[in-house]
A protein has these predicted regions:
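Structural motif
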Residues: 154, 470-474, 506
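Catalytic centers of nucleases
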Residues: 444-464
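Metal-dependent nuclease catalytic cores in nucleic-acid-processing enzymes
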Residues: 184-191, 341-349, 431-436, 488-508
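Domain-level recognition of nuclease-like catalytic cores that cleave nucleotide substrates
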Residues: 497, 501-528
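Conserved catalytic cores of phosphodiester-cleaving nucleases, focusing on short active-site segments
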Residues: 430, 455-461, 469-480, 492
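Feature representing long, continuous alpha-helical segments
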Residues: 424, 428, 432, 455-457, ...
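Phosphate-binding site recognition
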Residues: 1-422, 437-441, 445
């Protein structure tokens, strides 16, 4: 058992020994299926604290010849597979954590030589009669071992993208690292000695122009995870089971931590869910793992439409995004879409693959982004926040004239002439206008679908603010009347979103004239 060749199973044992462990060994069924095929080159990228290292350690514990793991996997999903024992601890495994290697290597520029030297040294102990003393190339060493003994290797690289993310300016080091990976994995020769390759990090494989630098790898990411989607984070079913065990309300957990839609799965951040179950408090558990220094420079980049897109998303809207041009690095940003795509990979945004839109996935992330912009004094947002706070105050004080003027201003500034009377624009106007409500209310709910000529939102106060803030039903329409909007809300009996709500309720009907663009507002108080 070596440090890099055939490690033991101790790291995965720590995960299994924890109070909460969610069984993700079903992934091994997939890797067993694709090993020694063209599909056996996998890059699975996901945000921080989404279980990347646990997955890498699980693969090592299952495949490595350096340990005996039958008892460890007994009772887990993989143990019920027909080929469970066929692959159990049967392979020579190479496992590198690039982040960890940085310090003993003596710096990023030494990573490739350090990994090569240390791994070759361990290979010589296993295969002393095959490798000559002077060999320095790791791909050549693996090729020689395969030619002499027929041995094939499983290669697992954790935090594969550290040099791409953290050493963005050091092009020489990056080029050396990419060339090393190419030599390891690309071409005919590597297919002879690679049984399975599994890379994990935050970024997919770096692109060069429009092509992947390792185009034989299949990228599974927060944009598309294909067959491994249920293993990216906690699924809804897994979270529901934890809620039953720990006595948490699932709908509340969903509001706070859901939002990543990957294929047919709703995916939750494992770190947040585990901390909630163990500590019992709904809050953001992201701060300990995220760097504000990384977020704010991104959203402050001088790209047309970027800041307004962030404000729209903070208010609950989805914005269109083209994810195809991003180069999978941290320096080649060409437009706002590249920035938004990177934020998706970081986990600060989610991606709707069907409609090709980006959005803020949940309450936890919304709070983190607002906090980040406040700490760095993002001036555009601060000015807008003040205006939005005044609008909320005027709404609660039932000052219809002031509300009408404020909505009219936002409608004018955030909507083009072409889209002024567009129904989706009305929705954006309402959600943007009431951005400040996010401190006290959950994400607004659109009660009725598009196609009815109006936009309506329901704002439900968070439990801790229900004694201070009423629920709000706000409707915006054109060429009718504000009173008519109020009557329509009443006819709908406030909609399904408020069926379980008990407390103070304000109805705000807003109407504007399409010709004059003059807005009017009527507000009524109700008790429910």
């Amino acid at each position: 058992m070596g440090s890099y060749l055939n490690p033991g199973n101790e790291a995965f044992a720590v995960a299994l020994n924890s109070e909460i462990y969610v069984d993700k060994t079903g992934l091994l069924t997939y890797t067993n299926k694709v090993m020694n095929t063209l599909q056996g080159y996998i890059c699975n990228s996901r945000p921080r604290r989404f279980g990347k290292s646990i997955t890498a350690n699980m693969l090592t514990a299952y495949y490595s010849k350096g340990c005996s793991s039958k008892e460890m996997f007994s009772g887990l999903e993989i143990s019920r597979a027909k080929d469970f024992e066929k692959h159990l601890n049967q392979y020579d495994v190479l496992h590198w954590d690039i982040q960890w290697c940085m310090e003993p290597a003596g710096g990023p520029e030494r990573i490739v030589s350090y990994i090569s030297e240390k791994t070759i040294s361990e290979l010589k102990e296993y295969y002393p009669h095959i490798l000559p003393e002077e060999i320095r190339s790791l791909p050549e060493a693996l090729s020689r071992i395969n030619a002499a003994s027929g041995t094939k290797f499983i290669v697992i690289i954790d935090e594969w993208d550290v040099l791409i993310r953290d050493e963005a300016a050091d092009l020489k080091t990056q080029e050396e690292y990419i060339n090393f990976l190419r030599a390891m994995f690309k071409g005919t020769e590597p297919t002879k000695y690679i049984q399975l390759a599994y890379l994990t990090g935050i970024l997919p494989v770096k692109k060069e122009k429009t092509q992947s630098a390792l185009n034989n790898f299949k990228d599974y990411s927060m944009l598309h995870a294909g067959p491994i989607a249920p293993y990216v984070g906690f699924t809804e079913t897994e979270v529901q089971k934890l809620c039953e065990v720990y006595g948490q309300k699932f709908e509340e957990v969903k509001r706070w931590y859901d939002g990543y839609q990957i294929g047919k799965y709703h995916v939750y951040n494992p770190n947040a869910v585990v901390n909630l179950m163990l500590e019992g408090e709904f809050q953001s558990y992201w701060s300990g793992t995220a760097s504000y220094e990384a977020i704010v420079p991104l959203i402050n980049m001088d790209f047309d439409g970027l800041k307004s897109a962030v404000i729209e998303m903070l208010s609950g809207d989805h914005v269109p995004v083209d994810v195809t041009s991003f180069q999978n690095d941290t320096v080649s940003f060409a437009n706002k879409d590249d920035v938004l795509t990177y934020l998706i990979h970081l986990g600060y945004l989610a991606y709707d693959r069907t409609f090709r839109t980006a959005f803020i996935p949940n309450e936890e992330i919304r709070q983190e982004l607002i906090l980040a912009t406040k700490r760095k004094k993002w001036n555009e947002l601060i000015v807008f926040q003040k205006e939005s706070e005044q609008l909320l105050k005027d709404t609660i004080q039932m000052n219809g004239n002031a509300v009408a003027k404020e909505i009219e201003k936002i409608h004018r500034e955030y909507t083009s002439v072409i889209r002024y009377n567009n129904e989706n624009s009305l929705s954006s106007v309402l959600s943007i206008a009431y951005l400040s409500s996010m401190q006290y209310y959950f994400k607004p709910i659109r009660e009725f679908p598009a196609g009815r000529g109006f936009a309506d939102f329901v704002f439900i106060p968070k439990p801790e603010f229900q004694n201070y803030y009423p629920a709000l039903v706000v409707e915006l329409k054109w060429d009718k009347s504000a009173v008519g909007a109020i009557e329509q809300i009443k006819e709908k009996q406030y909609g399904n979103a408020l069926k379980d709500y008990q407390g103070n309720l304000l109805l705000a009907g807003i109407n504007y004239n399409k010709k004059t663009k003059k807005h009017e507002c009527v507000i009524e108080a109700m008790q429910k």
